[in-house]
Design a protein with these regions (language model features):
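Conserved CoA-thioester-binding segment of acyl-CoA-metabolizing enzymes
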Residues: 1-57, 89
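Crotonase-fold acyl-CoA enzyme core
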Residues: 4-5, 90-165
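Hydrophobic/aromatic residues within transmembrane alpha-helices
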Residues: 21, 54, 66, 113-115
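A short, flexible beta-alpha/helix-coil linker loop
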Residues: 25-28, 68, 127
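Glycine- (often His-adjacent) and acidic-residue-rich active-site loop
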Residues: 37-38, 56-89, 106, 135
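Short glycine/proline-enriched coil/turn segments at helix->beta-strand junctions
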Residues: 46-50, 72-75, 94-96
Length: 165
């Protein structure tokens, strides 16, 4: 039974010369293939804007990569990581300012999205931002470590990359 139209994962709007890209999957804002493709398409759609704001849903900026895809096997995980890196690079190298409006929790690849942005602003609340991979003994990919070195103050860098907080 169909419950009606499905809301899009990503919506875009313009507020004068600023484009706003909103990501909302109705849950944790996990980055699966559909979400990554939708965000990449949204960046294509707003190329004429003077600046771009990327926002998540209330209380959930992004929980990172979709763990169902990551658990589907090494090929599926590699494919998702490759497209994720395409998104990270698109944001990091974007020719105009990208502002992340952190609307809630930003974990793992969600935190990397924040670091790919030129500026980050956050909602007030008891939200977590971090790289939990390192808390379970996983090492960060080199690009994530270098991105953190570029975007996080020295004071917070070690804590973020060694402790995940």
């Amino acid at each position: 039974m169909n419950d009606g139209p499905v809301a899009p994962l990503v919506t875009t709007r313009h507020d004068e010369d600023v484009a706003v890209i909103e990501f909302d999957d109705g849950k944790a804002n996990a980055l699966g293939h559909d979400a990554i493709e939708a965000i990449l398409s949204a960046f294509d759609e707003v190329e004429d804007a003077g600046a771009v704001v990327l926002a998540g849903r209330p209380e959930r900026f992004s929980a990172g990569f979709d763990l169902k895809v990551m658990a589907a096997g090494p090929d599926a995980a590699r494919g998702l990581l490759r497209r994720g890196v395409d998104l990270f690079l698109r944001m990091y190298l974007y020719p105009r300012p990208v502002v992340a409006a952190c609307t809630g929790h930003a974990l793992a690849a969600g935190a990397i999205l924040l670091m790919c942005s030129d500026l980050r602003i956050g909602s007030r609340g008891d939200y977590r931002i971090g790289l939990p991979e390192v808390t379970i003994g996983m090492s960060l990919p080199v690009f994530a470590t270098e991105l953190a070195r570029d975007r996080i103050s020295k004071r917070h860098y070690t804590r973020a990359t060694a402790l995940g907080t």
